[in-house]
Amino acid sequence: MDLLFLFFSLLLSYLFFKIWKLIDSKQDKDCYILDYQCHKPTDDRMVSTQFSGEIIYRNQNLGLTEYKFLLKAIVSSGIGEQTYAPRLVFEGREERPSLQDGISEMEEFYVDSIGKLLERNQISPKDIDILVVNVSMLSSTPSLASRIINHYKMRDDVKVFNLTGMGCSASLISVDIVKNIFKSYANKLALVATSESLSPNWYSGNNRSMILANCLFRSGGCAILLTNKRSLRKKAMFKLKCMVRTHHGAREESYNCCIQAEDEQGRVGFYLGKNLPKAATRAFVENLKVITPKILPVTELIRFMLKLLIKKIKIRQNPSKGSTNLPPGTPLKAGINFKTGIEHFCIHTGGKAVIDGIGHSLDLNEYDIEPARMTLHRFGNTSASSLWYVLAYMEAKKRLKRGDRVFMISFGAGFKCNSCVWEVVRDLTGGESKGNVWNHCIDDYPPKSILNPYLEKFGWIQDEDPDTFKVPDAFM
């Protein structure tokens, strides 16, 4: 009897040990954001309303028709007059970009952001175990990742990934790479650098679908420190809860809706097709189908299913009520309350229409979409790094409290929709905001005035006649 008791005691002890080891090992696989640093270019790269006019008027390929189109586009874009452009635009060389222009633009970003991030956290570049760099429209040899390693003299065994061509959703792809590495390697520190090089891709032709990108995309970038070190968990800002990636590259319509291309004159630019909203909506819906059960409580999912069931029964009884009679392109509401599982919504700043569309679909109010709106207004569409400017706005406004969940939603060429949820590890209301990119202007947002500076300065163009129009002397 004593032997039997001893046997079962040992067996139970072994089982408890295995369970403890399993739980303990999972803790080492968690992905935390330790800190992040958004890039604020120097003020001499700020695109004022006046300078926007100078850029447009010196393009000899444009006429009054294109001016009217651009005015309408920039007014409806939601962008303000304090965004940043590449340095070569201010030097008047946008028609003759060089490889060095693109590299210099990226060097200015990573020297600033990575340098500040490592210094603030008292981390040596040699402590970095994993480096992931994503810049879609610049591919150099050696890679940008290699240039960062060379500049900061990182270790020989650092694991390196250099992503190109992944579009505006690339930063979450970079985070996903880090997350998967953390599953296999414990006690690691990762650095993600996300940006976009606009210098080689500033379009100087007159194709409307390509010149539209000049109105939306602006310079920016972000460096993010991630870790699965147990000793750093209490210092972390966010913990990754889940991530879902959707790729519709197999669909021709989605694949071709936004693409880097040449126009008929051979000028390189970024094409934004009219079917882009449709492709984005389709990818977003597919993504939501997968991530929703992962992030919302069971009670809300049951309520939603019952609501759908009742609706289907009513439609069967009266088919005429099943028609929505909505105009084409109108975003549909998901019909589910995402606020039951999410406190904050970090939306990609692809444009005013993108933000409004997601806000409508998820039934968000003005408070929810304010961070994305203000980021678009202040910094423009900074491509893959835009999500982090939105997150920084929330932090600067002291919205992020311990236990809150942040839903990140991004879109990118391919066509891709990537989303993830972060849990706030501790109240973010104090010293961690020292390097926040919004610190210098957060009290000015939201702005009291809603007047559009572009409409005020260039609204007269709409009344001009092609036969009598003349470029004002102020822009010659």
From Swiss-Prot:
Superkingdom classification of source: Eukaryota
Domain FAE: 26-313
EC primary class: transferase
Keywords in alphabetical order: Acyltransferase, Endoplasmic reticulum, Signal, Transferase
GO terms, molecular function: fatty acid elongase activity
Gene Ontology CC annotation, any one: endoplasmic reticulum
Biological process, per Gene Ontology: fatty acid biosynthetic process
Catalytic residues of the enzyme: 168, 247, 344, 348, 377, 381
Catalyzed reactions: a very-long-chain acyl-CoA + malonyl-CoA + H(+) = a very-long-chain 3-oxoacyl-CoA + CO2 + CoA
CDD domains: CHS_like (cd00831)
Pathway the protein acts in: Lipid metabolism; fatty acid biosynthesis
Organism: Arabidopsis thaliana (Mouse-ear cress)
Entry-linked InterPro entries: 3-ktacl-CoA_syn, ACP_syn_III_C, FAE1_typ3_polyketide_synth, Thiolase-like
Main location: endoplasmic reticulum
Family as reported in the entry's similarity comment: Belongs to the thiolase-like superfamily. Chalcone/stilbene synthases family.
Localization per Swiss-Prot or TrEMBL: Endoplasmic reticulum
The keyword Glycosyltransferase is annotated on this UniProt entry: no
Tissue/organ expression: Expressed in siliques, flowers and leaves.
Conditions for induction: Repressed by herbicides such as flufenacet and benfuresate. Up-regulated by osmotic stress and down-regulated by low temperature, salt and drought.
Enzyme Commission numbers on file: 2.3.1.199
Signal peptide: 1-25
Name of the molecule in the record: 3-ketoacyl-CoA synthase 12
Matches recorded under Pfam families: ACP_syn_III_C (PF08541), FAE1_CUT1_RppA (PF08392)
